UniProtKB/Swiss-Prot annotation:
The gene is mrnC. PANTHER family: MINI-RIBONUCLEASE 3 (PTHR34276:SF1). Its cofactor is Mg(2+). GO terms for cellular component: cytoplasm. Homodimer. Its EC number is 3.1.26.-. It is an enzyme of class 3 (hydrolase). The keyword Coiled coil does not apply. InterPro entries: Mini3_fam, RNase_III_dom, RNase_III_sf. GO terms for biological process: rRNA processing. The active site is at 32. The keyword rRNA-binding applies. This is Mini-ribonuclease 3.
Length: 146
């Protein structure tokens, strides 16, 4: 299991003021980077070829996966977090044609939430990512056992 406290991408200082000034789309843009780095960090072990890393990461950073993970997080979110999610979801532009608009919007809300937590509450972000990591590792283990 990844030790999130030692993860190199967690902020040293939170910045709630900066987060309040950012648009939901900007939070989502930032959250997308946070999430992809988190996913890459998870799949670094065990060592494997770069192509295998890439396929695993792509499978988990897709809008469909992000929307599914938001469904998992939903019951664990505070009212304020759900507000950030909704703002991100509602700010989403039309996504790629391969993804239904509802899924794309939900993924954008998920990214906005992660971006917001990165800037405002690193401990909460750590808790959220730890919960996601449990689900991701369980999915990977189930897929490998087939």
């Amino acid at each position: 299991m990844v030790m999130m406290a030692s993860a190199p991408f967690l902020p040293i200082v939170s910045d709630a003021i900066a987060a309040q000034r950012l648009s939901p789309s900007a939070l989502a843009y930032f959250g997308d980077a946070v999430y992809e780095l988190f996913i890459r960090f998870i799949f670094l072990t065990p060592p494997q070829r770069i192509n295998a890393y890439h396929h695993q990461v792509v499978a988990h950073v897709r809008a469909e996966s992000q929307a599914r993970y938001m469904d998992i997080l939903w019951p664990h979110c505070t009212a304020a977090e759900l507000t950030i999610f909704r703002q991100g979801r509602n700010a989403a532009a039309d996504g790629p044609k391969r993804v239904p608009a509802k899924i794309y919007r939900q993924a954008t809300g998920f990214e906005a939430l992660l971006g917001y937590l990165y800037l405002t509450d690193p401990q909460r972000l750590q808790d959220v990512l730890a919960l996601l990591e449990q689900h991701i590792r369980a999915e990977v283990a189930a897929a490998e056992s087939l």
